[in-house]
Amino acid sequence: MFSGVYTALITPFKDYKVDFDAFEKLIENQYKKGVNGIVPCGTTGESPTLSCKEHEEVIEFCVEKAKGKMKVLAGTGSNSTDEAIYFTRTAKRVGCDGVLVVSPYYNKPTQKGLYLHFKTIADTIDIPIVLYNIAGRTSINIEPATVAKLFKNCKNIIGVKEASGSLDQMSAIKSLVPDIELISGDDALTLPLLSIGGIGVISVLSNIIPTEIVSLVKTFEKGDLKEAVKIHYKLLPLVKLMFIETNPIPVKTVASLLGMCSADLRLPMCEMEEPNRLKLEKALKDFGLLK
């Protein structure tokens, strides 16, 4: 359902408000470059600093602009189960193809708590759900056994975005539930994950170079592993620089350097340190993206 390349969209700001003009251009560029779908209101989209109203507006705007062109997998997670249900219901109402639900952050629930959180959302709203495991942000790992239990007991939980960084964990999930849609949440691990049965990536770097990320996945799908490996290593330096500071600071800085939108962030995210900015500029020039 959500195979291929999905872009974890940045949320452009101007004067501290969502810049919908720039947003529309970003979405159109993704469509023209051949991605399969977009993911608004995720980690890269600065969802924690969007107001409830903005969160809803961004999701609805993306559905409106992407309709008939590509799928929308909206971020609707929260550390409050009730709030996650609210955003998921909004996504269903406005016509999203599915939702990406991050594990609750800060609360540090047990595995039982995680199971009940996701199951309650799935039982309340009938929409395809992709779990989002990113323990580095949330402080809690969704264990493979919990993923398997949710997949077995909730017909609309169809996949997991894996950003644990552990191929062991990803392999364990696929072993327990071979039919689950296993999606990379880390650009550096897209090719390795594809090789063990993954179906695609929710990419940060595809905000900047969607064509190349699409090429990587399609080349692997065609069976040309040698060429896919070449693309992987070509992209790797840029992938690493996307995390030279906390995401989405680097990717927004790059988007600004390329004239796509402003580099404005909302506190506590802040402007990139100048030495890191210079490293980004050099990498973009080396890659031929900046003169």
Curated annotation (Swiss-Prot):
Annotated site residue numbers, Part of a proton relay during catalysis: 43, 106
Pfam families: DHDPS
InterPro entries: Aldolase_TIM, DapA, DapA-like, Schiff_base-form_aldolases_CS
Keyword Transcription: no
Catalytic residues of the enzyme: 132, 161
GO cellular component: cytosol
Enzyme kind, highest EC tier: lyase
Binding-site residues for pyruvate, renumbered to this chain: 44, 202
Pathway(s) where this gene product acts: Amino-acid biosynthesis; L-lysine biosynthesis via DAP pathway; (S)-tetrahydrodipicolinate from L-aspartate: step 3/4
Superkingdom per UniProt: Bacteria
Keyword Lyase: yes
Compartment annotation: Cytoplasm
Gene Ontology biological-process entries: diaminopimelate biosynthetic process; lysine biosynthetic process via diaminopimelate
Reactions this protein catalyses: L-aspartate 4-semialdehyde + pyruvate = (2S,4S)-4-hydroxy-2,3,4,5-tetrahydrodipicolinate + H2O + H(+)
Record EC number: 4.3.3.7
Keywords: Amino-acid biosynthesis, Cytoplasm, Diaminopimelate biosynthesis, Lyase, Lysine biosynthesis, Schiff base
MF GO annotations: 4-hydroxy-tetrahydrodipicolinate synthase activity
Subunit structure: Homotetramer; dimer of dimers.
HAMAP family: DapA
Function statement: Catalyzes the condensation of (S)-aspartate-beta-semialdehyde [(S)-ASA] and pyruvate to 4-hydroxy-tetrahydrodipicolinate (HTPA).
PANTHER family linked to this entry: 4-HYDROXY-2-OXOGLUTARATE ALDOLASE, MITOCHONDRIAL, DIHYDRODIPICOLINATE SYNTHASE
UniProt family annotation: Belongs to the DapA family.
Designated name of the protein: 4-hydroxy-tetrahydrodipicolinate synthase
Organism: Endomicrobium trichonymphae
